[in-house]
Design a protein with these regions (language model features):
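Thiamine diphosphate
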Residues: 1-10, 16-18, 68-69, 73-237
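Conserved thiamine diphosphate
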Residues: 1-58, 235
């Protein structure tokens, strides 16, 4: 139709808030299946600021998925017990916009590695980074790619990483069945299949409603230990 819809919708969601299926469920797969929406999901304060400002400047509808577990509701500590506080540069994004540049649609390699690639987004970026540190003590170096934007997602950055490492894990917090991670994995396989040394893996939450119980919620979503085991299995010789 050609009509502009300059609207940004912020949706708080995600685990570690003990709010059950009403607020903790990850719904990105619902939204990515609706053509025409731009979907962003920051993993840190700087990206949260930049992506929100850039979304506001677009003539298209943007869904901005903000993870409640990263808010720092517990004295500046996330639901995973970490501090991701940082001084946010409010000028850089404006300079990019003035130059016609944008972070939307561009993934970022947040950790370099040569043995395996983890592609992920949102709060799972921090789980991936912790798992990567775990296995680095055993001589395995993992590259972590933060998508930042789900639609359009930066397939090129992901493919280039997998062409280098030869192994792929896609990590999502949402339930495994029907998750967006399968779309990401399929797209990468189309271009990098012959370079894969092991079958690619999609890690997601158990196929169950998000429990209110802290113990049960922690059991259903991907943990550092689960991701570490998958890395070690993929890199076993």
């Amino acid at each position: 139709w050609g009509a502009e819809v300059p609207m940004t919708v912020r949706i708080p969601l995600g685990a570690k808030t003990r709010s059950g299926p009403f607020h903790a469920n990850m719904i990105e797969s619902w939204l990515t299946n609706d053509p025409g929406l731009i979907i962003v999901t920051p993993s840190n304060p700087q990206d949260a600021y930049d992506l929100l400002i850039e979304s506001h400047h677009l003539p298209d509808p943007v869904v901005y998925l903000e993870h409640i577990g990263l808010y720092g509701l517990r004295g500046g500590i996330t639901g995973w017990g970490k501090s991701i506080n940082q001084i946010v540069d409010t000028e850089a994004v404006m300079n990019r916009l003035d130059n016609g540049d944008s972070s939307i649609g561009k993934a970022r390699v947040v950790r370099g590695g040569e043995d395996l690639t983890i592609v992920t987004w949102g709060a799972m970026v921090h789980v991936a980074l912790d798992a990567a540190e775990n296995v680095s003590n055993r001589g395995v170096e993992v590259e972590v790619v933060d998508l930042r934007t789900l639609v359009p997602f930066d397939s090129g950055a992901c493919i280039n990483s997998v062409l280098k490492t030869g192994r792929l894990i896609v990590l999502q917090e949402s339930q495994w069945t029907g998750g967006f991670g399968h779309t990401v994995s399929s797209r990468i396989i189309e271009e990098a299949f012959w370079r894969l040394e092991t079958p690619p893996v999609v890690i997601g939450a158990l196929d169950t409603p998000v429990p209110f119980s802290p113990t049960l919620e922690d059991h259903t979503i991907p943990s550092i230990e689960v991701v570490s085991r998958h890395i070690e299995r993929a890199c076993a010789k």
